[in-house]
Regions:
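A short, charged
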Residues: 75-81, 85-89, 93, 154-181, ...
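Short clusters of small/polar residues that mark proteolytic maturation junctions
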Residues: 44, 54, 133-134, 211
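Short histidine-centered catalytic/ligand-binding loop motif
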Residues: 64-74, 129-142
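Rossmann-like S-adenosyl-L-methionine
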Residues: 187-348
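Non-catalytic substrate-recognition/targeting regions of SAM-dependent transferases
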Residues: 104-122, 141-219
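Carbohydrate-binding surface patches
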Residues: 116-118, 125-132
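Non-catalytic accessory regions of SAM-dependent methyltransferases
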Residues: 1-120
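Short, charged, low-complexity patches
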Residues: 76, 138-142, 146, 223, ...
């Protein structure tokens, strides 16, 4: 690892650091003496020590902060302790009724740039830990971190996910944020064999997960609880599932007794996976319609034809990759929400 450097702030720019915001943009820095990708001590304009993090000269977010304890070295013990804290925090949560979960969520767990999702296959009881190194600071120490993860993430550490045998680690560092960090994508096995398509459980339902080429790390784990919540409103309902991906909301809705589900997505392959998920759960295929196409255009067509639904699910992708795209993204989110509301029956 590169030696510790320093990043001195411009006068009056220390407030966000004191308030423990994890990012420092280039405009806040007066002078940096550090190696690209190396660790830095962040100093106020008058030289006071404020925090410690890692540095990327090519990113708009030039320093990502890790600790506000001057006596805390950024060694392997630090990273292990942060991982253990993240996993332990999830252990205290109520039962998940799922065999997959995000166990490390970057800044939210004090580990900016590191994501780790665990999928336990319900058939073989083998597990795949899908990891993402999204920042340069994680990239330069990825080997150490990837060796630590299987030591921390064990069946005993997260009993809510059940037991598993062999654990493979697979890297899906292909998010757009790597390009913003000046890095190319990387998708490859870290340890263990190349994973096959998995089948995970969620609230008693089975879902196909392609960790090699599916969206994100294979499944939208952030919507896991929401899929069950939405299903409570779907009994006897006609449901529109826009941006359906592999049909998670639709499968939950049909299990809850929806009269019909219309899955709309741009990806024909994702819709095909949704069809397989339906069959995997012995749900009636005749109550599901799938439409491959531009979601905005499809919803406008439904609006113009006067088609209405009792429940409309909108789970669009990220529309803005940077601040220059925010205005256009805002229009996109406004348009899709207005379209969704126009397709709701009164009381829907």
């Amino acid at each position: 690892m590169p030696e510790m450097g320093t990043a001195r702030l411009k006068p009056g720019r220390e407030k966000s650091v004191i308030n423990r915001h994890p990012w420092l943009f280039s405009g806040a820095l007066a002078r940096v003496e550090a190696e690209h990708g190396g660790d830095v001590d962040v100093l106020a304009a008058d030289g006071r020590w404020l925090a410690r993090g890692y540095y990327n000269a090519r990113s708009q977010i030039q320093v990502r902060l890790l600790t506000w304890d001057q006596d805390q070295p950024l060694d392997a013990g630090f990273w292990r302790a942060r991982m253990q804290r993240a996993v332990e925090g999830r252990r205290r949560l109520p039962a998940w009724n799922s065999s997959s979960a995000r166990l490390i969520n970057a800044e939210s767990d004090g580990l900016p740039g590191l994501v780790a999702d665990l999928y336990v296959d319900r058939g073989s009881a083998e597990a795949v830990l899908v990891v993402q190194a999204l920042t340069l600071g994680i990239e330069v120490r990825r080997q150490v971190l990837y060796e630590l993860l299987p030591q921390v993430i064990t069946p005993e550490a997260v009993p809510q996910l059940g037991t598993w045998g062999r654990l493979s680690v697979y890297e899906r560092s292909d998010a757009d944020t790597r390009r913003l960090e000046g890095m190319e994508s990387r998708v490859e096995p870290v340890c263990g064999p190349e994973p096959a398509t998995l089948t995970v459980s969620e609230d008693g339902l089975a879902f196909e997960v392609d960790v090699r080429s599916g969206h994100k790390t294979g499944l939208y784990l952030d919507q896991s609880r929401n899929r069950g919540v939405v299903a409570r409103h779907c009994t006897g309902a006609e449901v529109l599932n826009a941006f359906a991906y592999t049909g998670g909301f639709g499968v939950h809705a049909l299990r809850a007794g929806a009269r019909s589900v219309t899955d709309v997505d741009t990806s024909a392959s994702a819709l095909a996976a949704g069809r397989r998920n339906l069959l995997r759960n012995d749900l009636p295929a005749q109550r599901r319609e799938e439409v491959a196409g531009d979601v905005f255009q499809v919803l406008r067509r439904y609006r113009d034809a006067g088609r209405l639904f009792d429940v409309v699910v909108l789970d669009p992708p990220k529309f803005a990759q940077n601040t220059r795209q925010v205005q256009g993204a805002t229009r996109g989110y406004k348009d899709i929400n207005l379209l969704g509301m126009a397709l709701l029956r009164p009381g829907g």
